[in-house]
């Protein structure tokens, strides 16, 4: 094999690796958290991403004397995944998000949390495939496991990943 052929093969291999890397790169962590529900789109060579970004926060209050009244706050806005004001010492709070795949192809759903609220949040279902026109209800839980009493903020993203080409698996 000639020297020119070897160089051509090495360059070709590097270009293929670069294309694969760029084609499968997922959306990055947000630089700034949203204040209201926001939609954005992101594409690579192989996949389209639709991202719904939700603000999220909770204020964890200390439990004072047994007979003291404490004000709890609940957020009922459907676009807001805030958990309000809760007492500390093992409180569990849940919010529900309803998702529908309106497309005629499968979509992978990925849920992510960002900010200092992240360690407190969990999902009933994550990293799953939604079939065409399927509806799914997901519980988003926040559990205060003897966490420091303060405000926690961040963002919860619902990412829908769809293959641009039908022959590609969504994984």
Give the role of each language-model region.
Residues 1-45:
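Secretory targeting signatures
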Residues 27-58, 146-171:
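Terminal connector regions
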Residues 37-102, 125-127:
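Beta-sheet-dominated interaction scaffolds and their linkers
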Residues 77-79, 88-96, 134-137, 147-157:
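Short, solvent-exposed loop/turn segments enriched in Ser/Thr/Gly
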Residues 96-98, 108, 122, 137-141, ...:
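Ordered hydrophobic segments in well-structured contexts
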Residues 100-119, 157-160:
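Short acidic, flexible loop segments centered on an aromatic residue
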Residues 116-125, 163-167:
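Short aromatic-acidic-glycine turn motif
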Residues 121-147:
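Intrinsically disordered, low-complexity Pro/Gly/Ser/Thr-rich segments with frequent PxxP/GP/PP motifs
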């Amino acid at each position: 094999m000639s020297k020119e052929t070897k160089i051509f093969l090495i360059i070709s291999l590097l270009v293929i690796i670069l294309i694969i890397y760029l084609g499968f790169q997922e959306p990055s962590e947000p630089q700034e958290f949203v204040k209201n529900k926001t939609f954005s789109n992101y594409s690579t060579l192989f996949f389209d991403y639709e991202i719904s970004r939700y603000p999220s926060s909770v204020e964890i209050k200390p439990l004072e004397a047994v007979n003291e009244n404490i004000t709890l706050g609940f957020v009922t806005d459907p676009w807001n995944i805030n958990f309000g004001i809760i007492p500390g010492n093992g409180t569990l709070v849940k919010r529900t998000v309803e998702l529908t795949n309106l497309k005629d192809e499968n979509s992978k759903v990925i849920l992510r949390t960002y900010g200092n609220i992240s360690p407190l949040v969990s999902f009933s279902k994550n990293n799953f495939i939604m079939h065409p026109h399927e509806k799914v209800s997901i519980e988003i839980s926040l559990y205060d496991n003897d966490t420091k009493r303060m405000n926690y903020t961040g963002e919860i993203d619902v990412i829908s990943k769809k293959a641009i080409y039908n022959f590609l698996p969504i994984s």
